[in-house]
Amino acid sequence: MKKHLLFWSILFCNAAVAQTFSGGTGTKSDPYLISNVNDLKELSNMTDTPGADGTQQTYGKFFRLTQDITEPFVGIIGYEGFFKGDFDGGGHCITLNINMPTDNYVGLFGTVKSGAVHDLAVSGSVVGCNYVGGIVANPTNEALLYNLCNYADVKSTSTSMLSCVGGVIGGIISKAEGTMQGATVSCCANYGNVSSDGCALGGVIGYSGQQTGNTISDVANYGFVESSNSKRIAGTIGNPMWNDKVHRIANFGMLSSEDFSGCIGNANPTDIGEIIYDRQMAHSSVSIPAQERNTAELLGEGQKETLGDSWVYADGMLPRPNMNGLENSDIAVLYATPVILADGDKLDSVTKNFRVSLGNVENGKVVWKANNGLVEIQGDGTAIIHGAGTEVLTATYNSASRNVAIIIKGTDGINSINVSRNTGDDVWRNLSGQAVSTPTHGIYIRNGKKVIVR
């Protein structure tokens, strides 16, 4: 009987080290090739199964994604174990459909321990409980994460004080040992919706702490951050700790509550600088004047002196972290072309005509339209208000689209209908001068005067 057990043990161990990826031998010069969902499943099995000598099989191994994977991947790489190799996404995107609402450490990668994940985007949906991130749920020790882009919607079902939820990274939780330094995160961006009713929530990173100093630089949130809670929640990093190094961080996305911090929340690292956020998109009662900017101030090279050379700048567009080409994806370009409100206005309180960015790209302009008829968008991007209420603006760029809802409170300086009997042009015209046969709700020009029709 023991001979049979020994035979099956040897067979199992041999099977554990034999890999069947789309190619490669796992070396730096000949990495394992990841081309489909089956390869991702193989990597997940490899990560969770110890090798013949009991060591982590991914240690010292290299992996490269060869193409976008559009078939949804429903698993986790490093759920039972941890990833300790080098995963090069090659600038490609993996579609996710991970629905594990009662599980912790949920993301494309569950735990990355002193491994590297870079040059990768994910899309789709990720749902978990605590420590939930679109790309990495829990990087630890000297994990190296850079050039990462999340398009997925990331949701946590937790109401915990330490939910640790982020678009790119959930929570950097585990303690670095001995002389090890903390994790390094650089040149990452979130474009997805991030939501939880727990604490420690951020557009890019939920929580960073319990290590001997993590280094976080050149990261930005463009997505929507939503919670019914208000503690340790911010546009970009929910809860960095005092010993972190945090530099060149930006939030250009929207927040569901003004009780959130505009860019980083809760703790205040001693080594921190170059933090900015768009106060017209991310209206926050936690006001830090040195960090606040109007949208118009953020366009082009307006913040280059603050953010430096690791960002991409273009006229009429928001800065983007240089992510080795991922910053030029359709989604990244689209979210860098904002609604540009007048000074003093915010998304939930628009009182003046405004502009929309058309981008500054080689492959065509961003196209905007207003869905409820309260705003007229002209060819140069000027947006003319024709009435009060909620307007939904839709922006499209190639294959990508997004909606921006604004609440129009009315137009400054016009409070009633002005009926004129003066001679002259008796034709009803909109504010761009075009004749209107039957005026509806909005602002018009008639007989040389502005008239509001309620």
Question: Model segments located where?
Answer:
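Extracellular/luminal low-complexity segments enriched in Ser/Thr/Pro
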Residues: 139, 379-388
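A short beta-strand micro-motif common to beta-rich folds, especially ectodomain repeats
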Residues: 389-398
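Solvent-exposed, low-complexity, repeat-rich "mucin-like" stalks and linkers
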Residues: 335-366
